[in-house]
Amino acid sequence: MSSAIELKKQIVAEIAEKFRASKSTVIVDYRGLNVAEVTELRKRLREAGVEFKVYKNTLTRRALAEVGLEGLNDVFTGPNAIAFSKEDVVAPAKILSEFAKDHEALEIKAGVIEGNIATLEEINALAKLPSREGLLSMLLSVLQAPIRNFALVAKAVADKKEEQSA
């Protein structure tokens, strides 16, 4: 019997570590999804570097107490799955929101963003943000704009001087 207790303690420690290490965590109710749909969701999340796991609610509540996120205890009723992302803050919210639009059975319950409990509204707002790559490309275009404008002005001045000398 003690080996079962030790195994449960290891699982609680694993869950707590995942909550600590992840930049973004989203909790969903997956009740009503069939195996093919869950497999498709797992595939999309895995491609984005997001880990999607199902744990017993009692073990998850103990891990939440260990991490200091007891405010999420009310969320853990019924079948739940947790999406952990160590890299991209936006990825789990974006993928799960897009999937929930196509599959009404998937319900986003709450989340944790960089150690702070996030409401459903905050998760939805996060899902509407562009991806990290999209934000970087926007930043790059903003940084390139002055240089591009300077180059165009310099070319226009050179063309004008060329016309005057001709």
Swiss-Prot record:
Q: Does the keyword RNA-binding apply?
A: yes
Q: Which GO terms describe its cellular component?
A: large ribosomal subunit
Keywords tagged on the record? Ribonucleoprotein, Ribosomal protein, RNA-binding, rRNA-binding
Organism domain of life: Bacteria
Q: Name one GO biological process term.
A: translation
Q: Which InterPro entries match?
A: Ribosomal_uL10, Ribosomal_uL10-like_sf, Ribosomal_uL10_bac, Ribosomal_uL10_bac_type, Ribosomal_uL10_CS_bac
Q: Pfam families in the record, alphabetically?
A: Ribosomal_L10
The Gene Ontology terms for molecular function here are: large ribosomal subunit rRNA binding; structural constituent of ribosome
Q: How does it assemble?
A: Part of the ribosomal stalk of the 50S ribosomal subunit. The N-terminus interacts with L11 and the large rRNA to form the base of the stalk. The C-terminus forms an elongated spine to which L12 dimers bind in a sequential fashion forming a multimeric L10(L12)X complex.
What the protein does comes down to: Forms part of the ribosomal stalk, playing a central role in the interaction of the ribosome with GTP-bound translation factors.
Which family, according to the similarity comment? Answer: Belongs to the universal ribosomal protein uL10 family.
Q: By its UniProt entry, which PANTHER family does this protein fall under?
A: 39S RIBOSOMAL PROTEIN L10, MITOCHONDRIAL
Q: What is the name listed in the Swiss-Prot or TrEMBL entry for this protein?
A: Large ribosomal subunit protein uL10
Q: What is the lineage of its organism?
A: Bacteria, Bacillati, Bacillota, Bacilli, Bacillales
